[in-house]
Amino acid sequence: MSIKHYDVVRAASPSDLAEKLTHKLKEGWQPFGSPVAITPYTLMQAIAAEGDVTTPVLVKPSDGEGTVISATRDPEYYFVVVLAGQSNSMAYGEGLPLPETYDRPDPRIKQLARRSTVTPGGVACKYNDIIPADHCLHDVQDMSRLNHPKADLSKGQYGTVGQGLHIAKKLLPFIPANAGILLVPCCRGGSAFTTGADGTYSDASGASENSTRWGVDKPLYKDLIGRTKAALKKNPKNVLFAVVWMQGEFDFGGTPANHAAQFGAQVDKFRADLADMAGQCVGGSADGVPWICGDTTYFWKQKNESSYQTVYGSYKNKTEKNIHFVPFMTDE
């Protein structure tokens, strides 16, 4: 056969290898040779593809230095996942980015642009362009200027680390092979409903970086709904899949008792404002789009137990409204 792409699959056991190969076969790959045990705990299987595939392919540049990702095929349409809230929902991870391995981008995972370049000093982009997603997404607060002290910027280890890329990677096996994930980052560290500065909003650039106040028709909300609609308008086949929301700590110092009502009003307004695009929402209506509300860390939970129960407790028991709380840890 005429091989266009090569890659390898690593696994910890025969069953793990079989599961991973099943996914690869669906993506257009074929086994190339037999599996090899490279350590007592690691199996490796070479794979190859004659045509386009839907996963990233590692290739060496002609000078033999470094590793880059070869684009294969752009998705025909996207499942849109909106990321919103405060620091827990964005790139506040202080660890060293690993863009060649663990934080490796995937050509099926994109994001809506906000900054003027895809990466610091990189390719130019405009607000709401579709660009590759990596470990440091284009949120309201720009974290790309903060680098780990041991970062090698020549390897793309710029900025801080978020979980958006990894949420999308978890979803890829469950969507059609010709589809991708389009992330819409709208997070701002330190933001709240009951305290903080409104900031400003522009259709041309979104919410200003000093915007730290959520609520109906606040600049952060306008950024959220505006970018969500922009993502859907990119392609009539795009589908709004979910809103991943993580927010609450900064309301501990505001008026915690008012948080639940303001959050609920914002969800209702978001869904009402999407009524004209219901056909592009999962389930055929804006009410069908789940809000996935993440927990806070143990530190905040322990330090502010009463306020925690008021704010984060309000996310619980709302499944009938398609609002789902995901605990950071299981209560004993």
List the predicted regions and their residue ranges:
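Terminus-proximal functional modules
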Residues: 1-62
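Cell-envelope and extracellular/periplasmic
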Residues: 59-332
